[in-house]
């Protein structure tokens, strides 16, 4: 049976770089929250064992596409190689989240495929197993698989459930894509933030250590963030390029969006601590 599944965006409400491992991976402390806004995947299980993305993303080879990789990973885990009973899937992507935006679009798409096909193929894997599979696809995939707002440590793999205030956000989308290595590889990036407990971090002003680098090297990020800061507390999410302003009400966020200059593209969404994907999963069971 064909089903539609949400692949929500995330925000990093704060992001601190606390060190770097010998293998080059950065150690961090960050707070993830979902948005009630994102991509949509329409998935139809098939009997032929083939994984088909019906509308491939321009410029992304199939073997590099996280949607296809996630489906094949789950297929290999749940069914023996060459098993004639192994199901396939036709997957249609409605893409609204920008690539290189810091909203987790690719990771969220991959997580949605894992969670959705686990249900539709009747694999019966628990969320911990799915999250472990997801980690092999990317450090942000497990938080989307688990579906709870979370405090992340280590390289992002150590997750503690959290419950930040569910505010409204105006997210601005600068016309630029920022690759994570571009920011993490910058010699000026602050990598020695003090490690603090979640309780300490929740009572301190929120900050993103990647923000000064993104603002310095990407004029569009600087322009969009400077505009938002005139109206509300605003920050970079992830390594960018998207920036967000926080509001207590939807009306306040939409009022500011209505004043946005012609060069600014953005949207209003609510922060939620339970992923829309998991609400959809509960509704399907």
From Swiss-Prot:
The keyword Transport does not apply. Keywords: ATP-binding, Isoprene biosynthesis, Kinase, Nucleotide-binding, Transferase. InterPro entries: GHMP_kinase_C_dom, GHMP_kinase_C_sf, GHMP_kinase_N_dom, IspE, Ribosomal_Su5_D2-typ_SF, Ribsml_uS5_D2-typ_fold_subgr. The keyword Nucleotide-binding applies. GO terms for molecular function: 4-(cytidine 5'-diphospho)-2-C-methyl-D-erythritol kinase activity; ATP binding. Pathway: Isoprenoid biosynthesis; isopentenyl diphosphate biosynthesis via DXP pathway; isopentenyl diphosphate from 1-deoxy-D-xylulose 5-phosphate: step 3/6. It catalyses: 4-CDP-2-C-methyl-D-erythritol + ATP = 4-CDP-2-C-methyl-D-erythritol 2-phosphate + ADP + H(+). The active site is at 10, 140. SUPFAM superfamilies: GHMP Kinase, C-terminal domain, Ribosomal protein S5 domain 2-like. Belongs to the GHMP kinase family. IspE subfamily. Homodimer. PANTHER family: 4-DIPHOSPHOCYTIDYL-2-C-METHYL-D-ERYTHRITOL KINASE, CHLOROPLASTIC. This is 4-diphosphocytidyl-2-C-methyl-D-erythritol kinase.
């Amino acid at each position: 049976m064909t089903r539609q599944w949400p692949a929500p965006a995330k925000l990093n409400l704060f992001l601190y770089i606390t060190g770097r491992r010998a293998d080059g991976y950065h150690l961090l402390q960050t707070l993830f929250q979902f948005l009630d806004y994102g991509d949509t995947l329409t998935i139809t299980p098939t009997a032929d064992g083939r994984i088909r993305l019906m509308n491939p993303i321009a410029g992304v080879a199939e073997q590099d596409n996280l949607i296809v990789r996630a489906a094949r990973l789950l297929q290999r885990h749940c069914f023996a190689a060459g098993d004639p009973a192994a199901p396939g899937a036709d997957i249609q992507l409605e893409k609204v989240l920008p690539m290189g935006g810091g909203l987790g679009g690719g990771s969220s798409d991959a997580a949605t495929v894992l969670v959705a096909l686990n249900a539709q193929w009747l694999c019966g894997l628990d969320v911990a197993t799915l999250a472990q599979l997801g980690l092999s696809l990317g450090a942000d995939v497990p938080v989307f698989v688990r579906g709870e707002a979370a405090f992340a440590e280590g390289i992002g793999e150590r997750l503690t459930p959290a419950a930040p205030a569910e505010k409204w956000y105006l997210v601005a989308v600068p016309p630029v894509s920022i690759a994570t290595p571009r920011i993490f590889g910058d010699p000026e990036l602050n990598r020695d933030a003090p490690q603090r407990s979640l309780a300490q971090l929740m009572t301190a002003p929120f900050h993103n250590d990647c923000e000064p680098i993104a603002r310095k090297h990407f004029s569009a990020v600087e322009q969009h963030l400077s505009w938002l800061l005139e109206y509300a507390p605003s920050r970079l999410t992830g390594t960018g390029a998207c920036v967000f302003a926080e509001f207590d009400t939807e009306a306040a966020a939409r009022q500011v969006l209505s004043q946005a200059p012609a060069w600014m593209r953005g949207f209003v969404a609510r922060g939620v601590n339970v992923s829309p994907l998991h609400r959809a999963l509960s509704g399907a069971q």
